[in-house]
């Protein structure tokens, strides 16, 4: 059973450590780290180190939406396709995991796909609500062309 590497060592990474369980997390990964850093006793590894060991672990991206998208692009660019956006699983612990152990749940390819799908679905719904708000509160006939200033 693969343990978890949390990509992101900030506030959301610390929250993910608590939610996913310290016993299930091997370490953190951060693009901006020094090799001696630890958080809650967990080492913080560099992205370069992650590239060497990623096949042995589950990567959970524990960052805000903008940074999650940047890290997804970074991982995909380096050929890493198996990752789980934390924003795609947070809040589902009791509803989805149920009696299953978190590692058992997250090690399933089907559940990893569910987390990715859920992340993009929530992102879409958020953008849709912003567009709906804009449509309800603006008059397109009063918009002027951009001047570049």
How does the language model describe each region?
Residues 2-20:
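Glycine-rich adenosine-cofactor-binding loop
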Residues 6-7, 29, 60-62:
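Short hydrophobic segments within beta-strands
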Residues 10, 29-35:
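Short, polar loop motifs at secondary-structure junctions
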Residues 23-27:
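A generic structural motif
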Residues 32, 142-149:
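Conserved SAM-binding loop
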Residues 33-131:
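Phosphate-bearing ligand-interacting subdomains
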Residues 132-133, 141-143:
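Extended, small-residue-rich solenoid/repeat segments and analogous flexible loops
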């Amino acid at each position: 059973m693969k343990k978890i590497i949390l990509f992101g060592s900030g506030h959301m990474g610390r929250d993910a450590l608590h939610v996913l369980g310290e016993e299930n997390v091997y370490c953190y990964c951060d693009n901006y780290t020094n090799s001696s850093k630890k958080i809650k006793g967990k080492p913080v590894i560099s992205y370069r180190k992650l590239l060497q060991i990623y096949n042995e672990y589950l990567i959970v991206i524990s960052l805000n939406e903008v940074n999650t998208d940047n890290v997804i692009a970074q991982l995909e660019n380096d050929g890493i396709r198996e990752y789980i956006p934390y924003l795609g699983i947070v809040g589902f612990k009791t509803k989805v995991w149920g009696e299953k152990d978190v590692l058992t749940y997250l090690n399933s390819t089907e559940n990893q796909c569910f987390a990715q799908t859920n992340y993009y679905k929530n992102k879409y719904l958020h953008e849709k609500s912003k567009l709906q708000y804009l449509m309800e509160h603006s008059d397109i006939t009063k918009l002027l062309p951009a001047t570049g200033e």
